[in-house]
């Protein structure tokens, strides 16, 4: 697909004279365009749901969720991956973000990195990619060689693959087994796909990782019950989570958390089932860490 024919490279009539308007009007134009992004994502919800189910199946079988992208797309994958351990208590490495050009590229542009097909393949080889893993290729244009080659290599290994792009019929969408293509139209600044396309990608990644964690028992109701308390704010959040899940007092919640080494799931089961920490943990282990199953089946 030629660059000039891509929707993400088109000219946006709504912003054609954005350099001549007031600062407030400038903001209104950008905001009006941003409002269209969730609607574009809404149109591909069935595709997102299908991807979540596949990701969950693979991760449940011992696989990993691997994000692969260049530039803004790569950074968004790294952002999503890096938030999973503290938010959901998963081990670092379960969700992995890879970016063309390596760690240096997180903060700096690395010339030519996105054009390296070898880079996409080698980065996946370096993390020991296996057929159990799911590779999610992220590229607003859908034409990034680094991502396309990575998806091709992943499919050769037998991996399940997902392609996120914002141009219908792109190489990324046709190379991946599952295509997620929110079409957000032309950008406010022509070709600046870090804007609407980047926002759409972030919304999709939010759903993929959050959906995986919900289906993995990391959420009870709407509470992040595997949150790791790495700072004072999260210590307080843990107390509130146990309170909200059980209806107990803050003092009871804190006491339960202290007794079980600050594991929210265990504390919740302790309070709701009137158990000590060891027995609560045992029952959770018997039900794969799902609070709901402990409560419903016992």
From Swiss-Prot:
GO MF entries: carbohydrate derivative binding; carbon-oxygen lyase activity; ether hydrolase activity
GO BP annotation list: 1,6-anhydro-N-acetyl-beta-muramic acid catabolic process; amino sugar catabolic process; N-acetylmuramic acid catabolic process; peptidoglycan turnover
Matching InterPro entries: Etherase_MurQ (IPR005488), Glucokinase_regulatory_CS (IPR005486), MURQ/GCKR (IPR040190), SIS_dom (IPR001347), SIS_dom_sf (IPR046348)
Domain SIS positions: 55-218
Inducing factors: Induced by MurNAc 6-phosphate that releases the repressor MurR from the DNA. Repressed by MurR in the absence of MurNAc 6-phosphate.
Active-site residues annotated for this sequence: 83, 114
Catalytic activity: N-acetyl-D-muramate 6-phosphate + H2O = N-acetyl-D-glucosamine 6-phosphate + (R)-lactate
Keywords: Carbohydrate metabolism, Lyase
Pathways per UniProt: Amino-sugar metabolism; 1,6-anhydro-N-acetylmuramate degradation; Amino-sugar metabolism; N-acetylmuramate degradation; Cell wall biogenesis; peptidoglycan recycling
Enzyme class: lyase
Keyword Signal among UniProt keywords: no
EC code: 4.2.1.126
Role according to the record: Specifically catalyzes the cleavage of the D-lactyl ether substituent of MurNAc 6-phosphate, producing GlcNAc 6-phosphate and D-lactate. Together with AnmK, is also required for the utilization of anhydro-N-acetylmuramic acid (anhMurNAc) either imported from the medium or derived from its own cell wall murein, and thus plays a role in cell wall recycling.
Entries under PANTHER family matching the protein: GLUCOKINASE REGULATORY PROTEIN
Subunit text: Homodimer.
HAMAP family: MurQ (MF_00068)
UniProt cross-references to NCBIfam families, sorted A to Z: N-acetylmuramic acid 6-phosphate etherase, PRK05441.1, PRK12570.1
Miscellaneous remark of the record: A lyase-type mechanism (elimination/hydration) is suggested for the cleavage of the lactyl ether bond of MurNAc 6-phosphate, with the formation of an alpha,beta-unsaturated aldehyde intermediate with (E)-stereochemistry, followed by the syn addition of water to give product.
Family the entry assigns: Belongs to the GCKR-like family. MurNAc-6-P etherase subfamily.
Protein name: N-acetylmuramic acid 6-phosphate etherase
Origin species: Escherichia coli O17:K52:H18 (strain UMN026 / ExPEC)
The organism's taxonomic lineage, starting at the top: Bacteria, Pseudomonadati, Pseudomonadota, Gammaproteobacteria, Enterobacterales
